[in-house]
């Protein structure tokens, strides 16, 4: 279980600060390169859209890295948000481990 209190960098922060800004890319230019509407890129940049497998494959193709990179960024954020949500943790704690005989 994650124990850090600091929220990990989200997809939007990494996308903008580590990829778009150094390359001088606008949201419109990235949207064109990705073949998606600008709204899609805007939502990614503002952490209002989660990275799915197809989006991870597209980002990896555009930036020359791996889809796992993008999915792992999303996974870290999802896990952090879940473990820091009292309602989600209460729901998880209601789950009962199975007693499976060996």
Give the location of each predicted region.
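Residues within the helices of the helix-turn-helix
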Residues: 17, 28, 57
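The alpha-helix within a helix-turn-helix
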Residues: 20, 31, 60
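Short, charged recognition helix plus adjacent turn
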Residues: 71-102
């Amino acid at each position: 279980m994650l124990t850090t209190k600091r929220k990990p960098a989200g997809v939007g922060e990494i996308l903008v600060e580590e990829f778009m800004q150094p390359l001088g890319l606008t949201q419109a230019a990235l949207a064109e390169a990705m073949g998606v509407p600008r709204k899609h890129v805007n939502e990614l940049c503002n952490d209002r859209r989660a990275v799915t497998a197809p989006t991870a494959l597209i980002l990896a193709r555009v930036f020359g890295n791996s889809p796992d990179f993008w999915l792992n960024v999303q996974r870290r954020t999802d896990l952090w948000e879940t473990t820091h949500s009292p309602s989600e943790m209460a729901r998880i704690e209601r789950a009962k481990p199975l007693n499976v005989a060996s």
